[in-house]
């Protein structure tokens, strides 16, 4: 199993904790509102909204909350207007970071970002400083026991499959072309294969392998960033070395 897959496993474990944070629904509501504003309130004709609703429902968000967020996006209800801004920078050990935000106050957000980065051995960079290292892809997590790698390949071969990575819990992370995420989800559903956390992801061309001490520092920084209500997603090119996983689990 690659170090990147190990990091995916850690992120999956972290998600259970993240869901206890008060900011989870805030982030989901923002994404639904923005998606509805950009592409309309009908999920059948708005793939981004459809994906946002699926994510919200998988995290047990009540339908009333989802509908209110949609109506705020379409203007049927009064709501806050959000700007989507992407920041780039570096974390400990030279790890590249892309930070996607949705904010109603740009000055507050960038001040918070600088504060978090400076306290955690990170720094913001210029636009384009690290984005060239990443490509946007579709990503689907398939939990352990849902399917074998061979079954996934058979089901997804004609649905935009680009890569399958295993994790320590027997599950898989499926990577697709950015335009084929919906097709891959549909193929899994038709095959009766359970999946979770289907999303658009930013995958780096190359990874930097870290030992446990540096990996802890990067994870601490990412935790701090993800704890901010204005930050929707954080992507990095961190890979965890083969010998570091046990230390990180301690």
UniProtKB/Swiss-Prot annotation:
One of its GO terms (biological process) is regulation of DNA-templated transcription. GO terms for cellular component: cytosol. SUPFAM superfamilies: YebC-like. It holds the Pfam family TACO1_YebC_N. It is found in: Cytoplasm. Gene3D superfamilies: 1.10.10.200, 3.30.70.980. Keywords: Cytoplasm, DNA-binding, Transcription, Transcription regulation. GO terms for molecular function: DNA binding. NCBIfam families: PRK00110.1, PRK12378.1, YebC/PmpR family DNA-binding transcriptional regulator. Belongs to the TACO1 family. PANTHER family: TRANSCRIPTIONAL REGULATORY PROTEIN YEBC-RELATED, TRANSLATIONAL ACTIVATOR OF CYTOCHROME C OXIDASE 1. HAMAP family: Transcrip_reg_TACO1. This is Probable transcriptional regulatory protein Cvib_1432. It comes from Chlorobium phaeovibrioides (strain DSM 265 / 1930) (Prosthecochloris vibrioformis (strain DSM 265)). The lineage of its organism: Bacteria, Pseudomonadati, Chlorobiota, Chlorobiia, Chlorobiales.
């Amino acid at each position: 199993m690659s170090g990147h897959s190990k990091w995916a496993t850690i992120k999956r474990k972290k998600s259970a904790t993240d869901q206890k944070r008060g900011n989870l629904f805030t982030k989901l509501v923002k994404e639904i509102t923005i998606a509805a504003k950009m592409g309309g309130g009908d999920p059948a004709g708005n793939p981004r909204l459809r994906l946002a609703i699926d994510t919200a429902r998988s995290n047990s968000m009540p339908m009333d909350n989802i509908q209110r967020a949609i109506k705020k996006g379409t203007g049927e209800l009064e709501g806050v207007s959000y700007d989507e801004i992407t920041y780039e920078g570096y974390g400990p050990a030279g790890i590249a970071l892309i930070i996607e935000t949705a904010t109603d106050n740009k000055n507050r957000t960038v001040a918070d970002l600088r504060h978090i980065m400076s306290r955690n051995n990170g720094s913001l960079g210029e636009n384009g400083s690290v984005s060239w290292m990443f490509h946007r892809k579709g990503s689907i997590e398939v939990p352990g026991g849902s399917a074998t790698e061979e079954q996934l390949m058979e089901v997804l071969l004609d649905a935009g499959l680009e890569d399958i990575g295993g994790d320590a819990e027997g599950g898989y992370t499926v990577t697709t072309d950015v335009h084929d995420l919906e097709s891959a989800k549909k193929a899994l559903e038709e095959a009766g294969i359970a999946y979770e956390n289907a999303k658009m992801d930013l995958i780096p061309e190359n990874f930097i392998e870290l030992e446990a001490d540096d990996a802890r520092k990067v994870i601490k920084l990412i935790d701090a960033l993800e704890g901010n209500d204005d930050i929707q997603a954080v992507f990095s090119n961190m890979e965890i070395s083969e010998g570091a996983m046990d230390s990180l689990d301690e």
